């Protein structure tokens, strides 16, 4: 049995293209992997705090006592990291907002990137500590960006996930959503076909 963690990040709720793809992924995964456990964390509906000057102090060991706000942030960071490490497959819904991932998803990454816990520095360079995972990224875009200089999402996610130890990453794209109903429908259909292949793998 595998455990699947699904991270939603769209602010568009039911209108979200990435959200629809995520729901389709969950539906197909449950159908093909009946015994697996799926956990869904909606980072837009339940956002994590922005890492600011106060909160970053909670993520670094020190002698100074933590403020209540720092204590809460550290406890949440510990919870998110434990959740991440406890799952085998990580599904990340990453719609493109102004050429990048949603703020809500970036805030999550900022809370799980902790030296000595999800990565460490060695004489040979950084080493990821979140290993043995498989990641699937579902990315919807209004325009066409895949394999072009305007796609900042795929390279960024490859680097970040690899940095913490997740190197098995599959991307599913739904592009041209804003180009009209026909293009959007084809993009969704193609993305669902790609999801079917990922789920079956």
UniProtKB/Swiss-Prot annotation:
FMN binds at residues 10, 16-18, 96-99, 140-145. Keywords: Flavoprotein, FMN, NAD, Oxidoreductase. One of its GO terms (molecular function) is FMN binding. InterPro entries: Flavodoxin_fold (IPR003680), Flavoprotein-like_sf (IPR029039), FMN-dep_NADH:Q_OxRdtase_AzoR1 (IPR050104), NADH:quinone_OxRdtase_FMN_depd (IPR023048). Binds 1 FMN per subunit. Its EC number is 1.6.5.-, 1.7.1.17. The keyword Transmembrane helix does not apply. Its cofactor is FMN. It catalyses: 2 a quinone + NADH + H(+) = 2 a 1,4-benzosemiquinone + NAD(+); N,N-dimethyl-1,4-phenylenediamine + anthranilate + 2 NAD(+) = 2-(4-dimethylaminophenyl)diazenylbenzoate + 2 NADH + 2 H(+). HAMAP family: Azoreductase_type1 (MF_01216). PANTHER family: FMN-DEPENDENT NADH-AZOREDUCTASE 1, FMN-DEPENDENT NADH:QUINONE OXIDOREDUCTASE. Homodimer. Quinone reductase that provides resistance to thiol-specific stress caused by electrophilic quinones. Also exhibits azoreductase activity. Catalyzes the reductive cleavage of the azo bond in aromatic azo compounds to the corresponding amines. Belongs to the azoreductase type 1 family. This is FMN-dependent NADH:quinone oxidoreductase. It comes from Salmonella typhimurium (strain LT2 / SGSC1412 / ATCC 700720). The lineage of its organism: Bacteria, Pseudomonadati, Pseudomonadota, Gammaproteobacteria, Enterobacterales. The gene is azoR.
């Amino acid at each position: 049995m595998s455990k699947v963690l699904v991270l939603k990040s769209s602010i568009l709720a039911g209108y979200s293209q990435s959200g629809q793809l995520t729901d389709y992924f969950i539906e197909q995964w449950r159908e093909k992997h009946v015994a697996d456990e799926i956990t869904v964390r909606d980072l837009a509906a339940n956002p994590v705090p922005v890492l600011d000057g106060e909160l970053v102090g909670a993520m670094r060991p020190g002698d100074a006592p933590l403020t209540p706000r720092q204590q809460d942030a550290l406890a949440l960071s510990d919870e998110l990291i434990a959740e991440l490490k406890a799952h085998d497959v990580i599904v990340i819904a990453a719609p493109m907002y102004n050429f990048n991932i949603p703020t809500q998803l970036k805030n999550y990454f900022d809370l799980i990137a902790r030296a000595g816990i999800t990565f460490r520095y060695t004489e040979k360079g950084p080493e990821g500590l979140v290993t043995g995972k498989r990641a699937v990224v579902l990315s919807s875009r209004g325009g066409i960006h895949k394999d072009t200089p305007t796609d900042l999402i795929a390279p960024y996610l490859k680097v970040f996930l690899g940095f913490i130890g997740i190197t098995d990453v599959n991307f599913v794209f739904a592009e041209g959503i804003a180009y009209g109903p026909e293009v959007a429908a084809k993009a969704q259909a193609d993305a669902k076909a790609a999801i079917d292949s990922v789920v079956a793998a």
